[in-house]
Amino acid sequence: LNEVVNGVAPLRESHPATVGAVMTGRGRDACRNLGLLRDPHRAVRRLAEGHVVSRDLGLAAGPGARRVFIAGRGGGVVALVVRRAGAAGGRLRYLAAVLAGLRDYRPSQAVVDGPAGASWTGEAASVLVCNGSHLGGGMRIAPVARVDDGLLDVVVLGGLGRAELALWLPTVFWGGHLANRKVRSWRAAAFRVDMTGASALQVDGELTGGLPLEITAQAGALRLLV
């Protein structure tokens, strides 16, 4: 779905397009974030009804590339999860991927710049910029994020060690990680993010790169059949 949206998003001013999707992929975070039906037969019938809504996208501009995203963009240990999880999905698969990836984990030096005090400079396990509440196979990284409010949610997992990551990992499925004093979050329409030493970046669950990134909310940029 990310590839389709990136194909039509640049044309929205001159040739606006409406996207319809039947989701069968890993994690199905798009269903959770966008309100799509999970059952493919019901989803096809719903598409035929032609009900169109507007949803926000995030736009990430980095060295030589500009891409929009639906769920989120991030770097650090979350990208290691994507690399380890491969093509399969589901919570157990992602949990196993994180546990396996802990031996490769190294914290990065991160800089986050946003308005009104939304800033971070220091060691971070991950920096995640979320348009929707779910990513990574059902993880509720930003529980209050919405795809119709014109805002992005940034979540910084501070300098967590391997033992802390293993302990706090299960809590991301209900948003409990936000209770950790090393985790910070902010909401705004635009952020600048840089990470030194990040081994990989992910966008909507797929590996990509590079840094630094200027990330902005694109309010109502996606016309979607639901």
List the predicted regions and their residue ranges.
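Short, solvent-exposed amphipathic alpha-helical segments in soluble enzyme
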Residues: 9-10, 86-87, 143-146, 170-174
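Histidine- and/or cysteine-centered catalytic micro-motif in compact active-site loops
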Residues: 74-75, 115, 125, 129-134, ...
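Glycine-rich phosphate/pyrophosphate-binding beta-alpha loops
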Residues: 78, 128-142, 207
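Short acidic/glycine-rich loop or secondary-structure boundary segments that cap or lie
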Residues: 78-81, 120-122, 135-138, 162-165
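Gly/Ser/Thr-rich active-site loops/lids in small-molecule metabolic enzymes
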Residues: 88-95, 137, 143-164
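ATP/nucleoside-binding phosphotransfer catalytic cores, i.e., glycine-rich phosphate-binding loops
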Residues: 114-116, 121, 146, 156-226
